[in-house]
Amino acid sequence: VADIGLPRDATYWVGARATGSAAPGGATSASLTGQGQTLATIPGTTPVRVTTVVDLGATPRRLRPGVFLDDGLAVELAPGGRLRRLLDAAAQPGVSWAIDPALLAEVTDMADGYVLWAPPTSIPGTGVEAAKAWLAAYRALPAASGVQTLYGRPDLVGALGAGATAVLDRTQAATAASGLGLPVVAVATRVDAASLAALGRRSVAVVSPGVAATSPWALIGDAAVAGAETFEAPIRSPLIGDSPATRADVAVALARATGAQVRLVRTPDAAAI
């Protein structure tokens, strides 16, 4: 960097082109045979604060205590499954995590034995041991690195838009009844002015990929909001293409541009970035 006079603490396009000619001696004009480029971020002296939050949540599958719709949750909890891999990522040093108490209630129920709904009868579930192992690993997570989300993660934008103002009250009551004793943060895919105002009045902080990640925390209305990056969507630029490596390059470049970054990890692939 110093040799070519480029300042540090900046992001640059770096690429290479290969040209060639099939004619002896290069008698004809050379043509492009290949090219590649990527983003390269040169760190400065000021460290960039990056907070990684592993999101432990899943689509509900419990119909009533001890009865589940299917064994989809068992697949996610088993070794190599999405939730197992996310839990392993949450256990890494310096990583924060957020758990939906509704998920924890379902896994706890599974670990005690459960059946699958198969009218007019039921069949035994197969995920008891996977649930027990997952719970043991979850209980080993450092509590100081964790928060809990609102129970069941309701769509507050849709609920408040439909006039169902009691949804948030019921959700907060269920969250408190879970007894986890962790700080509460609303992890929401989408937010609007009404939902942020309602959460702000209840002093519930918000982490959302639906808010521009221009700073780690911002006050929007009365709510403390962290705009998060998920890096789940493919990179559609023809200049660099899409791969785990290019997503990592983009993540670093965005972090340098804003000075800080909250990464919300919801998939094992995103955990690798």
Residue ranges and their predicted role:
Residues V147-A177, I235-D242:
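Glycine-rich phosphate-binding "P-loop"
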Residues R85-V95, A176-I273:
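Catalytic grooves of carbohydrate-active enzymes
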Residues R139-L156, A218-A224:
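Short, compositionally biased "basic patch" segments
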Residues L63-P65, E106-D112, G158-G161, A193-G200, ...:
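A short acidic (Asp/Glu
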Residues V1-T51:
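Extended acidic/polar, glycine-enriched regions
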Residues D55-G57, I99-A102, L150-G152, A188-R190, ...:
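Active-site-proximal beta-strand/loop segments in catalytic clefts of secreted hydrolases
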Residues Y12-R17, W97, T149, A186, ...:
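Primarily hydrophobic membrane-targeting regions of prokaryotic envelope proteins
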Residues A30, G34-A143:
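Active-site beta->alpha N-cap acidic-glycine motif
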